[in-house]
Design a protein with these regions (language model features):
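Short, histidine-centered active-site or binding-site loop motifs used for metal coordination
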Residues: 12, 41, 108
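Conserved aromatic-histidine-acidic binding/catalytic patches
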Residues: 3, 50, 117
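Short helix-to-loop capping/linker segments positioned immediately adjacent to catalytic or ligand/cofactor-binding
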Residues: 15-17, 73-80, 114-116
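A solvent-exposed, acidic/Ser-Thr-rich amphipathic alpha-helical stretch
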Residues: 33-104
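Short, low-complexity N-terminal intrinsically disordered segments enriched in polar/charged residues
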Residues: 1-33
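A generic "alpha-helical surface" signal
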Residues: 6-10, 60, 120
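A beta-strand edge to alpha-helix "cap/lid" segment located at domain peripheries
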Residues: 84, 91-159
C-alpha cells in the first residue's frame, strides 16, 4: 500500500470512528464548504436534483442536524441514539494527486440503536475527497444502500 492509499484509508476509518464516538462537530469539520451528503433512493441514480433521495444535504443542513443532535432539548434523542460502522477495506477508485482529488468506495454494515430498537443498514459509501492545504476534506459523501428503495423509518444519525 503506497502512502496516499494508506492516508485515504486512514481518513475513511477515522471518519467512521468520529461518527461512532458521537464527535459530530469534529466530523462536520471534515467537509468542504460546498460539500454534499447524499443518500439516493435508487441504485445508479446520477442526479439528486432530478430524483428523490433519502437525504441530500449541504453543509448548512448538516450543521443544523449536528447542532440538533448536540442539543440538550432534543427530546426525540433522549436517550441518545448510538451507532457502529463495520467497514470493508476502502478501495481507491480514482486518484489524481496533481489536482488533489480522490474517490474512495467502502462497503459497510451500519447499526443504529436507540433504547431497545436496533436497525441494520448495508451499502457502499463513496467519498469524493479533495486536499485543502495539507488536509483531506470531503466534497461529496454518497451512501448507496443495498435496499435504498425500501420503506424506512427515521435515520437519526449519519452513515
Amino acid at each position: 500500500m503506497n502512502d496516499i492509499t494508506h492516508r485515504l484509508t486512514e481518513f475513511i476509518l477515522d471518519e467512521a470512528q468520529m461518527l461512532d464516538d458521537g464527535r459530530f462537530p469534529e466530523w462536520l469539520d471534515l467537509f468542504t464548504d460546498d460539500a454534499r451528503y447524499w443518500i439516493p433512493i435508487a441504485p445508479g441514480q446520477t442526479d439528486p436534483l432530478l430524483h428523490n433521495s433519502l437525504m441530500y444535504e449541504d453543509k448548512l443542513l448538516l450543521r443544523i442536524r449536528v447542532e440538533r443532535l448536540s442539543g440538550a432539548r432534543t427530546y426525540s434523542e433522549q436517550p441518545r441514539s448510538r451507532c457502529h460502522h463495520l467497514l470493508q477495506t476502502p478501495r481507491v477508485e480514482s486518484l489524481d494527486e496533481a489536482r488533489g482529488e480522490f474517490r474512495v468506495r467502502t462497503a459497510f454494515h451500519y447499526v443504529e440503536t436507540r433504547l431497545d430498537r436496533q436497525t441494520l443498514y448495508a451499502g457502499w459509501a463513496t467519498h469524493h475527497l479533495v486536499t485543502e492545504g495539507d488536509r483531506l476534506r470531503i466534497r461529496l459523501k454518497r451512501i448507496d444502500l443495498v435496499n435504498g428503495d425500501a420503506a424506512f423509518g427515521n435515520i437519526s444519525l449519519f452513515m
